[in-house]
């Protein structure tokens, strides 16, 4: 698997560079808990465990990485940011995508009023375009509340799946 700053999906893991060090990450898919673990090149590891499901623990994990790497604790490690533009083929992304890890979860995408919107893990969200087929998933009521990053995979002009961190959602509405 390649080593690069942008995360690379590695069969359930994500691998990337942070401040020149290789990081391998995984998040848990168990109902009722949120977990994220990472191995940092140099023999370090860290894990965040939360007893509430579908909670974004990224920022806490980043604090751990920053401490290990000697970076300012508030340093963010998002690899995609909204660019203010609109995706040219929104109709290709519309649909119901499902992941079947433990309890099935859905990522439902709709094109409404000139915006990609929908439901992600039972939350009302908007999808803000970052470039290529990558979107920031944000809370519909508060766009400063980043929930996840989505990368859609297209074939023949239609999304067959979407990756949200280390989870792959496949089109359910064939």
Protein language model regions, located:
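Catalytic loop of the DD-peptidase/beta-lactamase superfamily, centered on the K-T-G motif
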Residues: 1-174
């Amino acid at each position: 698997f390649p080593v690069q700053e942008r995360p690379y999906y590695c069969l359930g893991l994500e691998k990337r560079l942070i401040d020149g060090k290789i990081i391998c990450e995984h998040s848990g898919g168990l109902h009722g808990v949120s977990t994220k673990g990472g191995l940092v090149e140099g023999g370090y590891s860290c894990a965040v465990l939360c007893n509430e499901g579908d909670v974004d623990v990224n920022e806490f994990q980043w604090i751990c990485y920053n401490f290990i790497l000697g970076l300012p604790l508030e340093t963010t490690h998002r690899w995609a940011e909204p660019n203010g533009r609109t995706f040219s083929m929104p109709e290709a992304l519309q649909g119901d995508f499902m992941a079947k890890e433990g309890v099935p979860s859905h990522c439902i995408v709709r094109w409404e009023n000139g915006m990609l919107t929908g439901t992600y893990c039972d939350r009302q969200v908007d999808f803000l375009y970052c470039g290529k087929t990558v979107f920031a998933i944000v809370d519909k009521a508060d766009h400063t509340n980043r929930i996840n990053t989505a990368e859609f995979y297209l074939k023949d002009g239609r999304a067959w799946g979407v990756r949200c961190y280390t989870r792959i959602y496949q089109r359910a509405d064939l």
